[in-house]
Amino acid sequence: MERLLIVNADDFGLSKGQNYGIIEACRNGIVTSTTALVNGQAIDHAVQLSRDEPSLAIGMHFVLTMGKPLTAMPGLTRDGVLGKWIWQLAEEGALPLEEITQELASQYLRFIELFGRKPTHLDSHHHVHMFPQIFPIVAKFAAEEGIALRIDRQPLSNDGDLPANLRSSQGFSSAFYGEEISETLFLQVLDDSSHRGERSLEVMCHPAFVDNTIRQSAYCFPRLTELDVLTSASLKYAIAERGYLLGSYHDV
């Protein structure tokens, strides 16, 4: 049985090292898709690199936890910037949902201005779109715009609440992450998906070359290990041997 595998590299536009790593993993590896942070410090560099890599599908990485928002968000920013305090606000039931709705629309329009086309799909930095309060907003927006959405079904209480015309992969995994990155881990993710009977799977990854920005991240040197694994010829062979076809959200 042939299955669709989407290997999506998050954080396009975060830094030049991140951008170069994603392009390398696409050009010489198995990365087929990426998602861009339109408020990232290296987003213009990402746009420039993407012009020479037309095979790379590009979605939007909705940002509510880093940098400056595109709209006024007094309910979510501190000193004009976004941060991880969004988790505390969510726990307190204090998320400014109208501000988030407006920021989503603004980031989407900015993506189109930058790349000259709609994103292939939506996901988010630090998975904030899967917050129970935020997910309905993002799901409705994606369905209305006719674009796919990354869905981690584990936190969802009921798939039946999804808009009927919303597109996504049947499976999603964030397990290819951490200090124990290897080909074995990647293939285990595929085997687990196969055992669940999923016909399509997105695997999240973060390949990068280390630069000063990446050094400041809590997740730094494993990004280099990811790059090594994702550009392995033996991994590409093993994926094909398992009956997976590399693709993107265009194919969902």
UniProtKB/Swiss-Prot annotation:
Homodimer. The lineage of its organism: Bacteria, Pseudomonadati, Pseudomonadota, Gammaproteobacteria, Enterobacterales. Its cofactor is Mg(2+). The gene is chbG. GO terms for cellular component: cytoplasm. One of its GO terms (molecular function) is deacetylase activity. Involved in the degradation of chitin. ChbG is essential for growth on the acetylated chitooligosaccharides chitobiose and chitotriose but is dispensable for growth on cellobiose and chitosan dimer, the deacetylated form of chitobiose. Deacetylation of chitobiose-6-P and chitotriose-6-P is necessary for both the activation of the chb promoter by the regulatory protein ChbR and the hydrolysis of phosphorylated beta-glucosides by the phospho-beta-glucosidase ChbF. Pathway: Glycan degradation; chitin degradation. Keywords: Carbohydrate metabolism, Chitin degradation, Cytoplasm, Hydrolase, Magnesium, Metal-binding, Polysaccharide degradation. Pfam families: YdjC. CDD domains: YdjC_EF3048_like. Its EC number is 3.5.1.105. Mg(2+) binds at residues 61, 125. It catalyses: N,N'-diacetylchitobiose + H2O = N-acetyl-beta-D-glucosaminyl-(1->4)-D-glucosamine + acetate; diacetylchitobiose-6'-phosphate + H2O = N'-monoacetylchitobiose-6'-phosphate + acetate. PANTHER family: CARBOHYDRATE DEACETYLASE, YDJC DEACETYLASE FAMILY MEMBER. This is Chitooligosaccharide deacetylase. Belongs to the YdjC deacetylase family. ChbG subfamily. Its main location: cytoplasm. It is found in: Cytoplasm. One of its GO terms (biological process) is polysaccharide catabolic process.
